[in-house]
């Protein structure tokens, strides 16, 4: 007979649940006490969410919406039930000559490489599919619902990108939202699949 070993994070989650923790302040107090008692650094919310999900999957805990909200990190991002994902287009010549507009090499016009969204885009080579999938995974890890997604496309002047690039970029977004379904070959097909996907696009805006 195999004995399941409980991890420190799972042990903490069980203790927090048994203590009836219902707000971030009480959770942090328990984190601090646990940290002092066991001489370890405090658990991150991501670690606790992973442990919570594992305990539920093994049938050792039942789902509790209020407790889940306490463990979830940065709840304001999806407080309305809609999660936002920003995807950045690659650098492309802009016809504008605005004096105040930054023109950093290899960056979309008006954006700087030290901005969080741009840094994520750089890590994903400005690929729409990879950026979207990366953000979905991040949202899931931090406890956010991803069934309703509002996508914002930022970057250079969208209307001056080649039509082929516009279509491929947008298709990449939908293909990522449709994962793990196979990638669609056309934008129309990707949009159709997304109508019944787990991560549905309920809004798509181009802020360029």
Description of each model-found segment:
Residues 175-200:
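Short mixed-charge
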Residues 150-155, 202-208:
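Extended hydrophobic secondary-structure segments that form protein cores and membrane-embedded regions
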Residues 77, 195-207:
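Residue-level signal for functionally critical sites in structured catalytic/ligand-binding pockets
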Residues 1-118, 122-131, 135-181:
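Flexible, acidic/Gly-rich N-terminal and inter-domain linker regions that tether
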